[in-house]
Amino acid sequence: MGLEISYSNGFVLDKNLEVKLNKAFEVISAEEDLSQYSINIRIVNDKEMMDLNRKFRKKDSSTNVLSFTNNDISKSMTGNLGDIAINHDFVKRESIEQGKTFDDHIIHMLIHGIYHIPVSYTHLRAHETRED
């Protein structure tokens, strides 16, 4: 299956970056046995992310990434695991602050978002994994 990428407010990622995002999903899909599934990715701006964060998390602020699991019965028929919103404005600022390239950081946000969907990944699990 794969990633379905959509955009808000006219912002569009470079095609090479889209290829990298799809490759990252392919690698995770192979490792986590998710190749029969898809995930929707929406690239948003600060305003749209703030609206999503307010609506779903009751937080009046923007953030870099949000994940939404598809708990609908249609998941078994569509193979869609859920949605990830990635805030290009926030990621751009963070990449500069952290001395990373935009491409590397947005790929990191995709990976982070994916692990919050299908495998009930938590920050605690990430910490435990790093210590192994």
Model-derived regions: residue spans:
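An acidic/histidine-cluster motif and surrounding catalytic segment
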Residues: 1-106, 115-125, 130
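Nucleotide phosphate-binding/pyrophosphate-handling subdomain across enzymes
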Residues: 112
